[in-house]
């Protein structure tokens, strides 16, 4: 790349970066400290993002992203990679943390399949799909199984040196390159994420559960599917030789995982070939009528206004006490809640004033009545005396 091309590329990266972080005040703590939760879909990253936002939005700007398609959607700019955005922020002097999560292959495939089951795999509403038989869903899932949830960002995408194995004692990987910190977690250790991230980020992180498929409309079918699914024996061989499973799990953990699925094996099946799967993908996209854009699926959407920040603090304190979080931080809802509370306060004050005035009038009427009765009594006495 010659000098002119490099300058143009740098301008493109800057433009994309400004669209992501342009709303932040410069030279503030959250402007200078960035966390990219840069993971594949369906590995537990939504809960991680909401947890960090609730715990540390006052210290970090948190970005949740899966791939360059999402980056283009957010910025409108093509041909810029997420790695280039990460490197650019390091180049301009920011402290950068990049977090990825590993999830076991079968569970990740299941979750990814059900995430797109309505708009993509069956092109039907979740309400209707929820009435499908497990057999019907299983047949479709098995057709696409080998093509779902492939790859690993930490190993395949980040372009960093990879150690010989995952640290099964610390339960995380941390690679530092200048002012970029690359962190790898495992979903199976989510109960330790708070402790791990609190140490790395030097601030208290409380983990909250968020966006579980079990809680969606198709949650009933999803739970039933997970309980009843039998793994075709030819797919068991694929899982047994999965290089990511072998890297992130210890020998004992691998044996436990494979033993779990050995007890749930069934006859081999035929999947779509790669050309057949590509045809399947294109056909689904052409016929798609249901929107697959998710909105408001975080507990915390990251708004930094005074109202949302106050609600975030309340939720953080509840989470610290172990209270299950069911409420969300949605800016419009927070504003409406503030307005409602102000109206209630105003009504309370008005009612107090009205009651006070009512009591005054009552007292006044009582005094007038007493005075009138006294005058009447005196007049009667005088009248009797005259007689």
Locations of regions flagged by a protein language model:
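Membrane-interface amphipathic segments in extracytoplasmic regions
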Residues: 1-386
């Amino acid at each position: 790349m010659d000098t002119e091309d490099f300058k143009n590329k740098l301008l493109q990266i800057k433009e994309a970066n400004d669209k992501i972080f342009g709303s932040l005040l410069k030279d503030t703590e959250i402007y200078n400290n960035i966390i990219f939760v840069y993971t594949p879909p369906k590995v537990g990253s939504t809960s991680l993002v909401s947890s960090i936002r609730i715990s540390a939005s006052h210290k970090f700007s948190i970005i949740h992203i899966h791939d360059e398609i999402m980056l283009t959607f957010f910025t409108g700019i093509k041909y810029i990679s997420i790695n280039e955005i990460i490197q650019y922020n390091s180049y301009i002097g920011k402290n950068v943390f990049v977090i990825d999560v590993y999830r076991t292959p079968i569970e990740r495939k299941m979750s990814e399949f059900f995430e797109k089951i309505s708009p993509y795999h069956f092109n039907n509403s979740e309400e209707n799909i929820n009435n499908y038989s497990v057999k019907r869903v299983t047949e479709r899932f098995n057709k696409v199984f080998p093509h779902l949830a492939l790859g690993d960002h930490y190993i395949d995408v980040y372009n960093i040196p990879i150690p010989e194995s995952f640290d099964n004692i610390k339960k995380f990987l941390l690679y530092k390159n200048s002012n970029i910190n690359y962190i790898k977690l495992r979903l199976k250790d989510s109960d330790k994420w708070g402790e791990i991230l609190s140490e790395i980020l030097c601030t208290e992180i409380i983990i909250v559960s968020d966006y579980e498929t079990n809680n969606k409309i198709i949650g009933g079918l999803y739970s039933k599917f997970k309980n009843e699914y039998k793994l075709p024996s030819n797919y068991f061989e694929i899982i047994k030789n999965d290089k990511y499973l072998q890297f992130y799990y210890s020998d004992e953990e691998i044996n436990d995982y494979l033993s779990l699925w050995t007890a749930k094996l069934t006859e081999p099946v035929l999947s779509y070939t790669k050309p057949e799967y590509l045809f399947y993908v294109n056909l689904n996209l052409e016929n798609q009528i249901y929107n697959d854009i998710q909105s408001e699926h975080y507990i915390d959407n990251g708004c930094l206004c005074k109202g949302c920040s106050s609600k975030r603090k309340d939720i953080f304190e509840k989470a610290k006490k172990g209270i299950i979080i069911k409420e969300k931080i949605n800016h419009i809802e927070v504003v409406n809640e503030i307005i409602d509370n102000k109206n209630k306060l105003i009504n309370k004050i008005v009612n107090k004033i009205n009651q006070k005035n009512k009591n005054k009038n009552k007292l006044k009427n009582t005094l007038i009545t007493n005075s009138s009765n006294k005058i009447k009594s005196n007049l009667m006495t005088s009248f009797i005396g005259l007689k």
